[in-house]
Structures are given as C-alpha cells and as structure tokens.
C-alpha cells in the first residue's frame, strides 16, 4: 500500500449500527477489531483517521440485558448513556491492541451551529490528530433533545468531515453501496458505482428503509454525501463487512459507491453554514427571488419573501424554500421572525420606516448563503 501516492491526508470513517452489530443485537467485537486494524494501519501510514461510530443505543441494550422499555426519547437517552461508555471502552481496548489511543467527542447540533463552539470542536479534533490520537465521535444522545439533535450519524459524520477538513468520507453500512432500489425489497437491485450529481431522482432511490437497529437508511447517507461533496470531500458508501474495505477505499480501489467531490469547494464560512442545520425556520421565496438567489448569486431581499415559517432570532440559519417546500438555499437571517413578518413583500427602502431601524437591505446576504 503506497499511501503517499494516494493523496488523502485525513479520512472520516462512519460505522453504522448495522456494521457494529453485524445484524445481531450485540456489538460484534471480532469484527470491530478488524476495522480497528485497518484504521490503525492508515494512522501508521500517515493518513489521519476520525471515527464516527454509532452503536451506543445497541450497546446499552446489550449491557442491560435487553430490558423491556417503552420506546420513548428518555429511554433511548438512558440506553445511550449506558451504552456510550461501553462503546468507547470497546474502541479504546481494540485500538490499544495496535498501540493507539482514542479520544471521545460527543457532539450535538448546538456544537456545530454556534461558530465559537464549532471552532472549539475543530481545535479539539486537530489537537487529537496532531498527537496521533484517533478522535471517536458520536452524537451526545444522552443530552440531545430533538431540537438540538443532528439526528443521525450519517449527517454527523459529514459535518465532522467538514469540521476537520477531511478529504475522504467513508460511510460503512450493511449493503455494498447505493443501489438503484432498496436491495432488501428488490433482489435485482443494481449497485450504482459512481455518482457525479445528487438530484431528486437519486434521492427517490434512497427511499426510507432502515436496517434492524439503524437510523435513516440510505436517505441520510445521501444527505451526508451531498454535504461532504459540496465541501470538496470525496465520499464512498460501502459494506463494512467487505474485506479490507477501509484500506481499499483509501487506495481508490473499486468499492461500493463513489461520489465525486465538487471541484470548487465552498469557502470555510459557507462550510460552517452547511455544517450546522437549518432547524429553526424557513422562508418561502417567490419565483423571482429563487432565480435571483440560485442563478444570479444575489442576496435575498424582503420583496422576494412570500412568508415566514417558525420563530427565530436574528442570526439564525434558515432554509430558503420554494412554494412546493423544496429547499433551494440555506443562509443566516439578518432579521428575526417577528421583524420579517412585518417586512415580507416590502421594498428594502421601507424597512426602516416599518421597523424603526434596519440591518441592511439584504434579509439573507449572499456571503451568508449556500445555494443548494
Ligand atoms: N437504494 C438503496 N440502496 C441501498 N440500501 C438502501 C436503499 N434504499 C434503502 N436502503 C436501506 O438502507 C439500509 C442501511 O441504512 P441503515 O439501516 O440506517 O444502516 P446503518 O446502521 O449502517 O446507518 C439498508 O439495509 C437498506 O435496506
Ligand atoms: N447515536 C446513535 C446512532 C444513530 C444512528 O445514526 O445510527 P446508524 O443509522 O446506525 O448510524 C447511537 O450511537 O446509537
């Protein structure tokens, strides 16, 4: 393996519950050690690895002897709180076989949404990697309510890849990659080896199916792939049980589905906008505004806003959607929902007289916006 010729410096590996449990109800440590071996080999060859691991809830169930618990958020938090310590213990022991230390980062949406916390998380990741320690990331399920949850580890791993400026994201799951329909329900489904563009027809293929203990299925993997490739990060979706899968993916061998990265990655501030999540609010845009924003690279003005959805403060990241609810851009609002409700459809010149102040003509400035 000549990794110096490959060119990847930093790789994020995401392991789904389906991989960690091998489809059973418990952590498959025999398989985890094999994955740790491959990641350790990369670290020793000079390729830095960040591990994004699911499996806390499954590990919690196993550790407590499969208790009968109602399917509530609080009970999932209980299972994650118990299971996360088992999970990190397992990884710490398995990597120690290869002489490597691990460091744990449990993140929530809020850590990615707030610029200062985002930069702090980035510093921690870099400090670990600069010292040859493998960062192990999971969502902080025990404290995350639905509002502050990223929600699935596919998205979390993409955001982590942006955070640490990785150049490859490997999403490992229980299928060989992305198929043209769900291989669980269609045995004739065909593997898609290369994806250059992610559009609505591709999203439809991903459907909603999820393996036994997993969250999100292929749909969240596609979302993750889209976030990463926009930031100039290549993505591979492959089977976590394929022999040498991590090493082969890093050596650019033909494994699973490969997503080409966009050539002009977004600058860092736009990456941060994409790394956070537009959780709190939406603006519905008229046709002219959609065109101005998506085709002409303009800022969004109040005149082009048809309606405001949700309650939010100034400085919140919003989804900019069309009348069918399709998201066309994401950006930071210069006005609160309350203010926006007073100025929708109005000319920018009227803002000061309507509000008694103004924060500029743009409701969402183009420097604070990512067109999707
Ligand atoms: N087009 C598709 N190609 C591959 N898998 C798909 C597709 N559509 C849905 N799936 C489902 O997605 C599942 C993997 O997602 P998930 O259960 O969340 O796994 P993980 O725990 O690895 O994140 C597969 O088992 C498969 O049934
Ligand atoms: N944070 C959760 C996993 C959430 C998740 O996205 O799971 P998966 O679809 O298996 O990657 C856990 O550790 O159990």
Swiss-Prot record:
What does the record give as the reaction this protein catalyses?
L-glutamate + ATP = L-glutamyl 5-phosphate + ADP
Q: Which PROSITE patterns match?
A: GLUTAMATE_5_KINASE, PUA
SUPFAM superfamilies associated with the record: Carbamate kinase-like, PUA domain-like
> Which positions does UniProt annotate for substrate binding?
54, 141, 153
Binding-site residues, ATP: 14, 173-174, 215-221
Is the keyword Methyltransferase assigned to this protein? no
Q: What is its EC number?
A: 2.7.2.11
Q: State the protein's name.
A: Glutamate 5-kinase
Q: Name one GO molecular function term.
A: glutamate 5-kinase activity
Main function:
Catalyzes the transfer of a phosphate group to glutamate to form L-glutamate 5-phosphate.
InterPro entries given in the database record = AceGlu_kinase-like_sf, Asp/Glu/Uridylate_kinase, G5K_ProB, Glu/AcGlu_kinase, Glu_5kinase, Glu_5kinase/COase_Synthase, Glutamate_5-kinase_CS, PUA
Asked if the record carries the keyword Amino-acid biosynthesis, the reply is: yes
What Pfam families does the entry give?
AA_kinase (PF00696), PUA (PF01472)
Q: What subcellular compartments does it reside in?
A: Cytoplasm
Q: Name one GO biological process term.
A: L-proline biosynthetic process
Q: Which GO terms describe its cellular component?
A: cytosol
Its organism's taxonomic lineage begins at:
Bacteria, Pseudomonadati, Pseudomonadota, Gammaproteobacteria, Alteromonadales
The UniProt entry, under HAMAP family, shows: ProB
Entries under PANTHER family matching the protein: GLUTAMATE 5-KINASE, ISOPENTENYL PHOSPHATE KINASE
Main EC class the enzyme belongs to: transferase
The organism encoding this protein is Shewanella woodyi (strain ATCC 51908 / MS32)
